[in-house]
Amino acid sequence: MALELWQTLKEAIHAYTGLSPVVFFTALALAFAIYQVISGWFASPFDDVNRHQRARSLAQEEEPPIPQPVQVGEITEEELKQYDGSDPQKPLLMAIKHQIYDVTQSRMFYGPGGPYALFAGKDASRALAKMSFEEKDLTWDVSGLGPFELDALQDWEYKFMSKYAKVGTVKVAGSEPETASVSEPTENVEQDAHVTTTPGKTVVDKSDDAPAETVLKKEE
């Protein structure tokens, strides 16, 4: 059946065009290619613009709106890990120098699968300063860093301050310097004096910036 149809088609092509089937289909393919090239020359430049605009509008309709930043206040490092992007219902947070920023709008970078996803849900100050992706550098501790690394960290902080909303701080145990205790003055002014008692006399040696004085008092 198929052979009979092909034979009939060959005879029709030869009868109407005088060409063999191979030549006929080759000429047909060339004509289509030439048509595509010529039609591209006369295409309106606004067609591509309109096409891109339609694609962009469709993409915006598919993406859910970014929620407004929510203040989380002072939280611990463990609590910050809940905002690493694994839960799409929660904001995407990241901290620099104990300051927490909402980076939800840059989920393509800091969300799961992004190039900086390792930093999400953490205070990765040291890793940002060193541009390191090692697990040991995912910490707020920047001790031992050089001036160039600290400058790089400062640049990151300025970028986050200008681009993202600050929503809280990280409470880290031991991150604050200890406050030196100040002793209260005593009411007895002779507390700082060194008193030495010898038979028949009492020697009181007062320490001061001035030359030391020795007071002798005979025992009554």
UniProtKB/Swiss-Prot annotation:
Keywords from the named record: Cell membrane, Endosome, Lipid-binding, Membrane, Signal-anchor, Steroid-binding, Transmembrane, Transmembrane helix
Tissues in which the protein is found: Expressed in cotyledons, stems, roots, leaves, flower and silique stalks, pistils and stigmas, but not in anthers.
Pfam families recorded: Cyt-b5
Stretch list, region Disordered: 174-220
Positions of transmembrane segments: 22-42
Residue ranges annotated for the Cytochrome b5 heme-binding domain, each copy included: 74-171
Single Gene Ontology MF annotation: steroid binding
Induction (free text): Not induced by phytohormones and strongly suppressed in darkness.
Predominant subcellular localization, coarse grouping: membrane
Bilayer topology annotation: Single-pass type II membrane protein
GO terms for biological process, alphabetical: negative regulation of cell growth; regulation of lignin biosynthetic process
InterPro entries (alphabetical): Cyt_B5-like_heme/steroid-bd (IPR001199), Cyt_B5-like_heme/steroid_sf (IPR036400), MAPR/NEUFC/NENF-like (IPR050577)
Top-level lineage group: Eukaryota
Subunit structure: Interacts with BAK1 (via extracellular region).
Functional note: MSBP1 can bind to multiple steroid compounds with different affinities. Negatively regulates cell elongation and brassinosteroid signaling. May act as a coreceptor with BAK1 and enhances its endocytosis.
Protein name: Membrane steroid-binding protein 1
Lineage: Eukaryota, Viridiplantae, Streptophyta, Embryophyta, Tracheophyta
